[in-house]
């Protein structure tokens, strides 16, 4: 085994298997473990995915939300042990790979169209 194969095998052990299918424009709820002092609690962060980067264990997702009139963005490592769970609450319909233009929008203009899925008969 060479060094790359060893690294791949270690990374494969650390990767999460139970992940939802994520797409740009989806609204997701991310539950993150936060340590405050000696206590550990779970903090929820819900927002729209504006970008996804990298692959494998280094995959990141940038989530944006508006909190008290101010835009807040957080970058999450998808396979991090700090992430308790990730759930898709709403499917978005967009035609871009990066939604950085949402940073310049205010109010209702920041909404993303909802993807409507129909069941086949």
Swiss-Prot record:
Q: Which organism is it from?
A: Gloeobacter violaceus (strain ATCC 29082 / PCC 7421)
- Whichever gene encodes this chain, its name is rplS
Q: Which SUPFAM superfamilies match?
A: Translation proteins SH3-like domain
One Gene Ontology BP term is: translation
Cross-referenced InterPro entries: Ribosomal_bL19, Ribosomal_bL19_CS, Ribosomal_bL19_sf, Translation_prot_SH3-like_sf
**Which keywords does the record carry?**
Ribonucleoprotein, Ribosomal protein
Task: Extract one GO cellular component term from the record.
Answer: cytosolic large ribosomal subunit
Which HAMAP family is this protein grouped with? Ribosomal_bL19 (MF_00402)
Q: Does the keyword Amino-acid biosynthesis apply?
A: no
Function of the protein: This protein is located at the 30S-50S ribosomal subunit interface and may play a role in the structure and function of the aminoacyl-tRNA binding site.
Task: Give one Pfam family.
Answer: Ribosomal_L19
Q: Which family does it belong to?
A: Belongs to the bacterial ribosomal protein bL19 family.
Q: Name one GO molecular function term.
A: structural constituent of ribosome
- Protein name from the UniProt record: Large ribosomal subunit protein bL19
